[in-house]
């Protein structure tokens, strides 16, 4: 074999080896159709959550200021929970338009809206947790709660809660940015260094602060409340237990799927799970479960406010005296029925009964 033949053979082997090395490399996971799915699925659902959440939580704020006038810790927590949900839903029109088209609002709003979304998310979860603790003190430690459940302590704990929520949301403010790729503008979180580490920490932060800690506290508080109520001869006990069960089940049902999918995406990010089909399913699942979790902010006014008999009475008064486009509300028969029910109700005056009605 001469030198020319050796050279040709070497080149052929190089081409052969390079070809099969390229073929053996993992191909990028194509995710065609995921954005198209989001364009159809997300905007109408975001709009619905925005409208329902804006209406329900605005009514809560209006009633609290007009009738309750923030006289207790419970009132303070209800107000802050409503403000948290309002802050959260006010970001949804931006995300809805972004899902349908692209980000057209600039870098400043990209950072602000991302931050609003996270602050509303964390503060809402935290105030749900505080509502559970408030109920626990009112029913399990009724005497001690007379000193602990004051307006002053309510304001102090609320300020601390907002501070923690703002601090936990700082990554959304600092790392959110706009960039253009293939003539499409994005608003996303981008980490300059240790990208994988930051993504994993952010996801775990949501799992821990958004589900594990609040759920643990809720389960403890409500289990102790139920145990205390078992020793009370209270005609409202069964209703209370059903309501507690509903609160926990709804929280689990709306937030657990999103956190599970988020945790699975963390495993994909760490390359613990490496499956293209799974990644595609997770991208669809994160859109569906995130929207499901958003609906919970529409239910908060119903769970913590509208189901209370005193608050239904205030809402009746509010709509019966309303003016303008809602003037026909005062003619609604169901509101008059609620009003009649309120005036005909009779309750015992025990400490636990009084605190229980305030808490629920």
Swiss-Prot record:
<feature type="topological domain" description="Cytoplasmic">
    <location>
        <begin position="309"/>
        <end position="360"/>
    </location>
</feature>
<dbReference type="GO" id="GO:0006935">
    <property type="term" value="P:chemotaxis"/>
</dbReference>
<feature type="topological domain" description="Extracellular">
    <location>
        <begin position="268"/>
        <end position="284"/>
    </location>
</feature>
<feature type="transmembrane region" description="Helical; Name=7">
    <location>
        <begin position="285"/>
        <end position="308"/>
    </location>
</feature>
<keyword id="KW-0325">Glycoprotein</keyword>
<feature type="topological domain" description="Cytoplasmic">
    <location>
        <begin position="134"/>
        <end position="150"/>
    </location>
</feature>
<dbReference type="InterPro" id="IPR000355">
    <property type="entry name" value="Chemokine_rcpt"/>
</dbReference>
<comment type="similarity">
    <text>Belongs to the G-protein coupled receptor 1 family.</text>
</comment>
<dbReference type="GO" id="GO:0009897">
    <property type="term" value="C:external side of plasma membrane"/>
</dbReference>
<keyword id="KW-1015">Disulfide bond</keyword>
<feature type="glycosylation site" description="N-linked (GlcNAc...) asparagine">
    <location>
        <position position="183"/>
    </location>
</feature>
<keyword id="KW-0807">Transducer</keyword>
<feature type="transmembrane region" description="Helical; Name=6">
    <location>
        <begin position="243"/>
        <end position="267"/>
    </location>
</feature>
<feature type="topological domain" description="Extracellular">
    <location>
        <begin position="1"/>
        <end position="39"/>
    </location>
</feature>
<keyword id="KW-0597">Phosphoprotein</keyword>
<dbReference type="GO" id="GO:0016493">
    <property type="term" value="F:C-C chemokine receptor activity"/>
</dbReference>
<feature type="topological domain" description="Extracellular">
    <location>
        <begin position="99"/>
        <end position="111"/>
    </location>
</feature>
<dbReference type="GO" id="GO:0006954">
    <property type="term" value="P:inflammatory response"/>
</dbReference>
<protein>
    <recommendedName>
        <fullName>C-C chemokine receptor type 4</fullName>
    </recommendedName>
</protein>
<feature type="transmembrane region" description="Helical; Name=2">
    <location>
        <begin position="78"/>
        <end position="98"/>
    </location>
</feature>
<feature type="glycosylation site" description="N-linked (GlcNAc...) asparagine">
    <location>
        <position position="2"/>
    </location>
</feature>
<dbReference type="InterPro" id="IPR050119">
    <property type="entry name" value="CCR1-9-like"/>
</dbReference>
<feature type="glycosylation site" description="N-linked (GlcNAc...) asparagine">
    <location>
        <position position="194"/>
    </location>
</feature>
<dbReference type="GO" id="GO:0006955">
    <property type="term" value="P:immune response"/>
</dbReference>
<dbReference type="GO" id="GO:0001764">
    <property type="term" value="P:neuron migration"/>
</dbReference>
<keyword id="KW-1003">Cell membrane</keyword>
<dbReference type="InterPro" id="IPR002239">
    <property type="entry name" value="Chemokine_CCR4"/>
</dbReference>
<keyword id="KW-0472">Membrane</keyword>
<keyword id="KW-0297">G-protein coupled receptor</keyword>
<feature type="disulfide bond">
    <location>
        <begin position="110"/>
        <end position="187"/>
    </location>
</feature>
<dbReference type="InterPro" id="IPR017452">
    <property type="entry name" value="GPCR_Rhodpsn_7TM"/>
</dbReference>
<feature type="topological domain" description="Extracellular">
    <location>
        <begin position="176"/>
        <end position="206"/>
    </location>
</feature>
<feature type="topological domain" description="Cytoplasmic">
    <location>
        <begin position="68"/>
        <end position="77"/>
    </location>
</feature>
<feature type="transmembrane region" description="Helical; Name=5">
    <location>
        <begin position="207"/>
        <end position="226"/>
    </location>
</feature>
<keyword id="KW-0675">Receptor</keyword>
<dbReference type="Pfam" id="PF00001">
    <property type="entry name" value="7tm_1"/>
</dbReference>
<dbReference type="GO" id="GO:1904936">
    <property type="term" value="P:interneuron migration"/>
</dbReference>
<dbReference type="GO" id="GO:0048872">
    <property type="term" value="P:homeostasis of number of cells"/>
</dbReference>
<feature type="transmembrane region" description="Helical; Name=1">
    <location>
        <begin position="40"/>
        <end position="67"/>
    </location>
</feature>
<feature type="transmembrane region" description="Helical; Name=3">
    <location>
        <begin position="112"/>
        <end position="133"/>
    </location>
</feature>
<dbReference type="InterPro" id="IPR000276">
    <property type="entry name" value="GPCR_Rhodpsn"/>
</dbReference>
<feature type="transmembrane region" description="Helical; Name=4">
    <location>
        <begin position="151"/>
        <end position="175"/>
    </location>
</feature>
